[in-house]
Amino acid sequence: MPALSASTLNTPALPWRVRVVEEIGSTSDALREAALAGESAGLVLFAESQTAGRGRRQNRWLAPKGKDLMFSLLLRPEAPTAFWPRVTTLAALVICRAIEDELPLRPRIKWPNDVYVHDRKVAGLLAEAVTTSSGLMLVLGIGLNVNTRDFPPDLSDTATSLLSAVQPMPQLHLDRDSLGRAILQQLHHQISRIEEGFHEAISEVRERSWLLGRQIRATVDGREIFGRALDLDQEGHLILALPDGSITPLSSAERVRQVV
């Protein structure tokens, strides 16, 4: 399977500085350390293999070497920091669009930070703030299952890859460079409009929502909340109808599951 190419992933007209490494513990941890050492925003780090990749709640992100997209971006959006939580929502939308542009799939967004295809997780995102000597920065980590065919038993019913989702198409593999480049191009555009363009984007996020209308169980600050996902507000918060008839917005959650 072809290795990732930094020269192909780079787009000269955009401010990204793309690097590709063979193996690393975690691309997000590496960028956090780079930021603390004085690295400027715009660095994007792809890895063919991660030995300590992670998602929310420190869950490990496992992927076979050279098959998927595992990368992180070091960001400093020009908008006030109050708008930075929007980055994860915009990135999920970008991933959906990039997949749809390349493949005959209709990805959906599972609030707050996953992308689903055929009711299974195909991508996860994690944004973390880091305080540096030059001010606040953001590390956005993205894991996208592209060419993985086999998953561990504990994930086989809940995870998928793009290649698995488009079978029986004849390709032996999907082009990771093309998909990664498309994500970087669209992500730059969306982040540049994080302040004034978000309300337009959130309408599409609603249309792509996997959760809306479902009964869910969310873990928020260690406690469980049950309810029906009604809507997303203009900031991308989940509006939940509770069993007692009250309505509550959730700005984040450690875990969200559908209640069958």
Sequence positions of predicted segments:
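Long, positively charged amphipathic alpha-helical accessory segments at protein N-termini or as interdomain linkers
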Residues: 3, 13-14, 79, 85-107, ...
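Conserved active-site carboxylates
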Residues: 114
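N-terminal lobe of the biotin/lipoate ligase/transferase fold
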Residues: 1-101, 173, 260
